[in-house]
Amino acid sequence: MSNKKGLQALSPLFLLIVLIVAFTVYSVDSSHQDTSLSLTVAFMISSIYAVAISGGMPVRKRVDTYSKGAGANNLMLMLWIYVLAGSFAASAKAMGAVDATVNLALSILPASMILPGLFLAACFISVSIGTSVGTVVALVPIAAGLAHSMDANVGMMTAIIVGGAYFGDNLSFISDTTVVATQTQNCKMSDKFKVNSMIVVPAAVLVLIAYSVMGVGLQAPTHINEVEYMKVLPYLIVLITAIAGMNVMAVLTLGTLLCGAIGIGSHLLGASGSYDLFGWFSAMGNGIIGMGELIIIAMMAGGMLEIIRENGGIDFIINKITAHVNSKRGAELSIAALVSMVNICTANNTVAILTVGNISKKIGDRFGVDNRKAASILDTFSCMVQGLIPYGVQMLLAAGLANLSPMDILPYLYYPLAIGVAALLAILLRYPKRYS
């Protein structure tokens, strides 16, 4: 493929980036109050442009290709999770589960330990369940509630959970990315875990220290309401079932049913902060509607990225990056660049590793790259990119649960950036020595 055709195939992505930057600058201008002018319009314009430049295909075929990406199986699964997450979050908030859980956290932890405590909780849960999505679903509503109670930055508190969720996504033995990375690079999970830990654990410790320092100035509310332990039960059950390995959709359904049962039961007993049957239905409906914009963004992202793939954009990236490799360090950098660029184009780190896994193995074997380090590079850089793109599943889900724009969360995502820097230094400085 010629440079012209390859760059044209990728141009919708370039346009999207320009629009996101422009809309972000517009939104932070104090003279403009509508901070929601970000991703929906940006993706609509980029999608129309992507369909328009797809020469050589009739318009119907272009639209079919776009629709295929927008309705892909893995994307639709995420959309159902958005629907259930919105339903659960709104049900829990309306019956007082969020407030009760926040009061419990504030009664146990001093205010200065809230930030590092949230990060450690996200790291622990994500390692236990192997999925960043489940971690975001379980903890973001609590983090957002704490932020409101402590008059802290909601975007920052949400970003702590999103960042910590990638600790487990990167290291957990049951994470999809770990499984795919080790299978494509033909190495043991335990060996990959050792190498990967040497690279990212120091970054996690530094981020934890940073959150500890940032938390020193936080003040707890002067008055903390009495904890209603029954209303904490839905979140407790969600955490336990998620850690036990239950499917995330089943977890959310169970959590929503528990919220309804406790809320309606409290109403029948005359307790305040509860709802009747139709109040529960109304809360669920509002939660689902609240996720509507993010669902549209996710579908438009899937459609546009499918157009890019169909036009040869991903093949162009792979060919260009692998054309000039001539050393072990260069091979490792090319593996990192491959998975990063493809992740930007697919918005799915597991798919990105699957796409470039075999070519990365060939590059690694040719230049003597240790399979364990290659797997660590694939996993770490894919998690870094997935954690920073504003149209990724986890970011959109977190934004919906916290009632924010993804751009409100992005500036505070320290951990994904930290592991990216750590992995890059590991390549440049030949660390760990034994595997370099």
Feature map (PLM): residue ranges:
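Core transmembrane alpha-helical segments of multi-pass membrane transporters/permeases
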Residues: 39-44, 52, 63-96, 112, ...
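Alpha-helical transmembrane segments of multi-pass membrane proteins
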Residues: 81, 112-125, 151-167, 330-343, ...
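Membrane-interfacial loop-to-helix junctions in multi-pass transporters
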Residues: 72-78, 103-120, 147-157, 201, ...
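Hydrophobic alpha-helical transmembrane segments of multi-pass integral membrane proteins
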Residues: 79-89, 109-142, 321-359, 378
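Interfacial loop-to-helix junctions that mark the boundaries of transmembrane helices
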Residues: 2-5, 27-41, 69-73, 105-110, ...
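Re-entrant/interfacial helical elements at transmembrane boundaries that shape
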Residues: 134-146, 162, 173-187, 350-364, ...
